[in-house]
Amino acid sequence: MEIKELQDIIQQNGVVGAGGAGFPTYMKLTDKANIILMNCAECEPLLKLHRQLLEKHAYEIMKTFHMIQETVGASEAIIGIKKSYVQTIHALNQHIEEFPGMRLHLLDEVYPMGDEVVLIYEATGRVVRPGGLPIEQGVAVFNVETVYNVYRAVEEKQPVTDKYVSVVAEVSDPVTVRVPLGCTLEEVVAQAGSTTVKDPVYFVGGPMMGRIGNGSDPVTKTTNAILVLPKDHLIVAKKQRTSSIDLKRAASICCQCNTCPDLCPRHNLGHPIDPAKFMRAASNNDFRDLNPYIDASFCSSCGVCEMYSCPQSLAPRSLLADMKGGLRKAGIRPPQGVQPKPVQESREYRKVPEERLMARLGLTRYDKDAPLKEELVQVKKVRILLSQHIGAPAQAVVKAGDEVTRGQMIAQPAQGLSVGIHASVSGKVTEVTDRYIIIAVK
């Protein structure tokens, strides 16, 4: 298959990164990639979706990954997977010899191994420059569910209409379920039995980089997990703090221990981000050197500094995120052409063990099986967002009153970076706005 043909199939079928920011997958297909890398590092604590999906559909996913390798002409296809995922590794080893040029790379159980910059270094030894893209190093990264969605688009002619989501923590029956896009978080949580605390908080995504959601929020193409947490949990409390309070606390109790840059994954790969210098400058209104502020652009927001490193429970990640947002609003782009310094010699000893991270965050007791159930959950109504990806929102091609069937395109890719959106249920369109489409099931 030619690259352009595969790009068109992927774009029209709405395949984007099934996690993170939802980068349109078709844009990653280029003959500049001499290595393609599958991310099965399950970056966040408690998440098990990717290892489950890869174990269940090992052959289909590997076959598709090999097809991508041949299409772009990559010399090597690497599956990055944590060495503790024994059952999934066994499933992969049953087929690995069928795919020339494909190999497994076993990873340590540390956080944030799923950060693509970290993963690329671990699997290939290549360092992506600060603010750069993986393809500059000849690498294209795909996660497991994304590759499975490519398989469904190419082999089964099925667009992306549903999402696998894990529901864990304060629920009676932790589970990973397949749900239609646009259903509510509450409907997903209901599949895990009953909640085990009063007034639970829905934490969408992983505990390190996730957000607090509302029960009525719709599931999107990037929704990986819902953590049901007590309202007084440490993670919830950290997420609810305000920037003004965070800044005052930094000014009054930062002890200048320097642990935040010592453990910062990007800093240890030679990137110029330095949380300690930023906190020192920001908390003292010190603008004599602007580099600590400008270098905030290179923060990955992994949260190691804020959730693990700081002995004073300060919030470098949150304040850096505010700075990044302010720079964007002011039209200040990250410096271009910045080259990384040499990788820290002590980097191997500065990795954050995931088991220790879970203990520090009060999550160890939630680390339980969440069995994968593939039967599609049935709902009565969906609210499908037109922007579930990086780039321009899709443009609606249906109107209120139209009858649609599951899998039908309801919004076409816009000009520029964009993908199609499809009906996740069959029914009647009841509302169309510039942000979403509502479909009621008959």
Regions found by a protein language model. Name each.
Residues 2, 19, 46, 125, ...:
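Flanking helices and flexible, charged tails adjoining ferredoxin-like Fe-S electron-transfer domains
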Residues 38-50, 171:
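Gly-rich Lys/Arg/Thr-decorated short loops/hinges at beta-loop-alpha junctions or inter-strand turns
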Residues 75-78, 83-185, 191-198, 206, ...:
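Hydrophobic alpha-helical positions that pack around
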Residues 207-209, 243-247, 418-434:
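Short, compositionally biased
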